[in-house]
Amino acid sequence: MIDFLKQLPHLEPYGNPFYFIYLGIALLPIFIGLFFKKRFAIYECLVSITFIVLALTGTHASQILALLFYIVWQIIWVYSYKRYRSQRDNKWVFYLHSFLVVLPLILVKVEPTINGTQSLLNFLGISYLTFRAVGMIIEMRDGVLKEFTLGEFLRFMLFMPTFTSGPIDRFKRFNEDYQSIPNRDELLNMLEQAVKYIMLGFLYKFVLAQIFGSMLLPPLKAQALSQGGIFNLPTLGVMYVYGFDLFFDFAGYSMFALAVSNLMGIKSPINFDKPFISRDMKEFWNRWHMSLSFWFRDFVFMRLVIVLMRNKVFKNRNTTSNVAYIINMMVMGFWHGITWYYIAYGIFHGIGLVINDAWLRKKKTINKDRKKAGLKPLPENKWTKALGIFITFNTVMLSFLIFSGFLNDLWFTKK
C-alpha cells in the first residue's frame, strides 16, 4: 500500500505554478456548476481527496494512513459526544471528549521531544483539523451545534483549500456557507476577489518571501552565528528579515487558500489584515493570524475567564484576565511545539497583552483625573498613533525572533 502511494506524484499545496494549473482545471466544473446554482457534491469530494492525497504522497506517503486513522478517531469521539449531548450534559464528559479529540495532536507534539523522532500519527494539517474537531465539541456543549450528518462532518474536516494550514473555520459558519449557493453577481465578485488573492499571493509567497527568506536571511544568520554572543547587529537584521519572511510566506499561503475557497463557493475567514500597522498588542492579535487568534479568544481565553471567576480564584477581575491572557498565549505557544522558544513566544505575548491592558486602564484613569482638573485628555493624534505603531511593530518583531528558534542556535549550539 505504502509503495503504491509513493509512486503517485507529489503536489506541494500552493508550492509551484503547476499546482495552480492542475487545481484550476479541477475547479472549473465546480465553478461552472455554482454559476448555474448547482453543487456537484461528489465531484467536489473527489477533488478535495485527490489533492489532499497528492499533498501527502512521495516521502510523506505514510501520512495518508495517519490521516485515515485520525479521521476515524475523530468520527468516533465527535459522534459519541453528539449522541451523549442530545440527552445529557456533564462537564467531565465534555472534558474527556475534548481531551480524546486533542490526544493525537498531543502525541504528535510530545513524541519528538521524548525520543527525537516524528510520531507515526503525524500528517500535514493535523493541527488545523484538530481545531475544527475541538470547535465542534465545544459548540455542541454550548448548544450552538446540534445536528449534522457524517457527510457534512467529513466535508468540513477535509475541505481541501484550508486543509494544511488554515484559515481555521467553524462548522456552523462553513456549513451555512456551503448550503447557500451564491447568486451570479456574488459569484462573479468572489471570482474577482479570487483573482486578486492569487495575484497578491504570488507577490507575497513567490517574490517577497523568496527575497526575505532565501536571499537576505541565510547570509544574515551566518554573520550573526560567526560573531556569536548574546546579541549582535546581524541578529537585529535576522529579527526584521525573518519577521517579514514569516508574514509574506504565511499571508501568501492564506491568500491562495481564500482564492480557492472562493472558487468553490465558500468565503473562508481571512487571516491577516495589515498587522504591522497595529497600534497596540491587542489590535495586533485582531489583525494577525485572525482565525487562530479568534479561536483561542473564544474557546480558551473567554472560557478560562469564566471558570476562574465562577470559582472565585482571584478577587480582582483584572488579575483574572491577566492570568487568562498568559495561560491562553502559553497554550498557543505549546501548540506550535514543545520547545523553549515557542513557549517563551507565547508567554512574551501574554505579558504583552497584560501590559497593554494595564496601560489602557491607566490611560483611562489619567484622562478622568485630567478632566476633573479641567485639563484636556492625553493627546491622540497622528504622532501618538505613529509611536504606538512603532512600539508594537518592534515588539512583535522581537517576538518573531524568539519564535524563529534562531536564538537557540546563537546561544546554545556549539560552534
Swiss-Prot record:
It is a multi-pass membrane protein. GO terms for cellular component: plasma membrane. Its EC number is 2.3.1.-. Keywords: Acyltransferase, Cell membrane, Membrane, Transferase, Transmembrane, Transmembrane helix. The gene is dltB. Changing V305D: Reduced binding to DltC. GO terms for molecular function: acyltransferase activity. This is Teichoic acid D-alanyltransferase. InterPro entries: Ac/AlaTfrase_AlgI/DltB (IPR024194), DltB (IPR024024), MB_O-acyltransferase (IPR051085), MBOAT_fam (IPR004299). It comes from Streptococcus thermophilus (strain ATCC BAA-250 / LMG 18311).
